[in-house]
């Protein structure tokens, strides 16, 4: 059984995914890295996910996300960090759910907003003319949806790093293989 960590940008999916994988002694997979590799192979151009989204557009980016998630069907006993937007597509959620325990890393809206709006340049999903409102709208929509699709939600707002890793490991111990 895999452990899938997902949540809104800036919640720590990659950071905690690496730490949990190390503690469990298993592989760590970051779907963003795989998207970048596939794009580089297909287009002979090395770009970050943000750059791919901007250059190729949201449809191409979501198609790459879908391709990556479908390619993980035979992966077992791994920790997988999945970009927040990927979880908005039903087919991605269902593909991951087959062999994975989905954990939503919840972080307080104001904490995340501060992190995300401090990025330069702003993420592509933020309207530069009204960054706070666009973040609040995105957060509200995704949080509602994520709570419906997750197996478990972990509120990491006031938790220390070690405790977060410990809690994720505990959550996955009781899951049937």
Regions found by a protein language model. Name each.
Residues 22-31:
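Post-Walker A helix-loop "phosphate-sensing" segment adjacent to the P-loop in P-loop NTPases
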Residues 5:
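Hydrophobic anchor at the beta1->P-loop junction of P-loop NTPases
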Residues 99-143:
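A glycine- and Lys/Arg-enriched "phosphate-lid" helix/loop adjacent to the NTP-binding pocket
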Residues 14:
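Walker A/P-loop
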Residues 19, 23, 140-177:
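NTP-dependent small-molecule kinase module
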Residues 8-11:
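P-loop (Walker A) phosphate-binding loop of NTP-binding proteins
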